[in-house]
Amino acid sequence: IKSDKIKLKKGKPKTDINSSLKYISLTNKFYIIPDDSIEVFNQINISKAVSSNLQKPIIKNNHINKLTIKYGTKLKSNNIHISKIIISHLIKLNLEKHVYLTIIEKKIILIIFDKKELIFYNQFDLSNNNYVKYLILLFDEYKLDQKRDKIYYISSDISKKKVLNELRPYFFSIINHEKSIFDIITNECK
């Protein structure tokens, strides 16, 4: 499969229908938990305290490099969360401390990696250009320098020129990531 042949389809797939297809969950209601904390997490009824999304019929666990990603779904199989796909890709790179940004299906995803270690991951709904505000807050929180530290933009179906033009007044080192989000999805879902 080539990334230019990926077709995004919105909707709510039914359980066990089209089982040869892979479904990517974009839900904002998920948890990334270090494996050494998973037992404590499982003892807490987190869905009552934080999110009702984990009360769906099936709670999926995606695993990657000593991390567990938990999210609720109606699908029994062929379901993977977008965070696992992106983390799996970035963890293979030998990285200095970098910030990553991608936008897919009206979801903003912000990530900080430092030498194959996930420092920060968050995703939320896109509203106008609120990713600029969140990037500024992220740089402030992690004491990053807007003139020196790099932002890698993982391109998607949003106009790359528009995103870069909105970021340039605030950030000086914006680099296009070598692969688009669709290339990453294609490679990680083989």
Where are these regions (language model features)?
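Hydrophobic/aromatic-enriched cytosolic interaction surfaces used to assemble or bind macromolecules
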Residues: 1-190
